[in-house]
From Swiss-Prot:
Species of provenance: Escherichia coli (strain SMS-3-5 / SECEC)
Keyword field: ATP-binding, Coenzyme A biosynthesis, Cytoplasm, Kinase, Nucleotide-binding, Transferase
GO cellular component, one term: cytoplasm
Enzyme class name: transferase
Major localization listed first in the record, in broad terms: cytoplasm
Descriptive protein name: Pantothenate kinase
Record-listed ATP binding positions: 95-102
Family classification: Belongs to the prokaryotic pantothenate kinase family.
Enzyme Commission code: 2.7.1.33
Record flagged with keyword Transferase: yes
Database matches in HAMAP family: Pantothen_kinase_1 (MF_00215)
Subcellular location: Cytoplasm
Length: 316
């Protein structure tokens, strides 16, 4: 089916891997194999081929959008007769736990910062905006970590609102996966980036998710381009369990790790524990809160085995 025929039936243009890879045009590869190895997640196979065929075309598309946005800002400044403030272009990346959002974010940050324009690209994860464990315990939400109600949404919305308002120095809290908590007094200062990549589970949520509270303001209201990283549920579960097993042999062995006790589990016990955590927390959050937002994304990356993207859908 031609792209023209597809547009009559869906709000998305659909590309298989080869079609999407052809859109790279002549964009040069700016990352080495060593750099790619440092960017990938604990449980992912990220190759030069994946970067070349998926992420270089995506960085080219984003560069077009960002340049267009800057021209629009210049038109407004000319109309108003002002010297405009630096307003960052915000890209959000959503998707399930274990799907590879963080790797996608890091690769895009590296690629976008190496375009000839040398734009400053900041990466912030919404994990830092989780309520501290003490608050979650008081509210009975420790088993709902990652669900919308576990976040300090007011602070997260204020963060992106301040950036879009041109506030020069904006602070974001930082989360530690070692201690499984927000780091006290560990805020990171973001200083007028050209591009902000915001990575998190629920960054595509909108007023549609809260019909009882129609006056809510959401992160998605400030996002210029949104990406949803998708994969079949059976693969997500497998990736989550495999990641848990690797943490059991790595990060969990640190005596300071919140999950240090998991390091003592047998492999069978670890698999059963990971399965329980997946089904009772992460799968539930995916079905209730994350997956329903997928079709709001500007672009959907669908992965198959080995974290390889097999299909790209771009909102027209």
């Amino acid at each position: 089916m031609s792209i023209k025929e597809q547009t009559l039936m869906t709000p998305y243009l659909q590309f298989d891997r080869n079609q999407w890879a052809a859109l790279r045009d002549s964009v040069p590869m700016t990352l080495s194999e060593d750099e790619i190895a440092r960017l990938k997640g604990i449980n992912e196979d990220l190759s030069l081929e994946e970067v070349a065929e998926i992420y270089l075309p995506l960085s080219r598309l984003l560069n077009f959008y960002i340049s267009s946005n800057l021209r629009r800002q210049a038109v407004l400044e000319q109309f108003l007769g002002t010297n405009g403030q630096r307003i960052p272009y915000i890209i959000s990346i959503a998707g399930s736990v274990a799907v590879g959002k963080s790797t996608t974010a890091r690769v895009l940050q590296a690629l976008l910062s190496r375009w000839p324009e040398h734009r400053r690209v900041e990466l912030i994860t919404t994990d830092g905006f989780l309520h501290p464990n003490q608050v979650l315990k008081e509210r009975g939400l420790m088993k709902k970590k990652g669900f919308p109600e576990s976040y300090d949404m007011h602070r997260l919305v204020k963060f992106v609102s301040d950036l879009k308002s041109g506030v020069p120095n904006v602070t974001a809290p930082v989360y530690s996966h070692l201690i499984y908590d927000v780091i006290p007094d560990g805020d990171k200062t973001v200083v007028q980036p050209d591009i902000l990549i915001l990575e998190g589970l629920n960054v595509l949520q909108s007023g549609m998710d809260y019909p009882h509270d129609p006056h809510h303001v959401f992160v998605s209201d400030f996002v210029d381009f949104s990406i949803y990283v998708d994969a079949p549920e059976d693969l997500l579960q497998t990736w989550y369990i495999n990641r848990f097993l690797k943490f059991r042999e790595g990060a969990f062995t640190d005596p300071d790790s919140y999950f240090h006790n998991y390091a003592k589990l047998t492999k069978e016990e670890a698999i059963n524990t990971a399965m329980t955590l997946w089904k009772e927390i992460n799968w539930l959050n995916l079905k209730q809160n994350i997956l329903p937002t997928r079709e709001r994304a500007s672009l959907i990356l669908t992965k198959s085995a080995n974290h390889a993207v097999e299909e790209v859908r771009l909102r027209k």
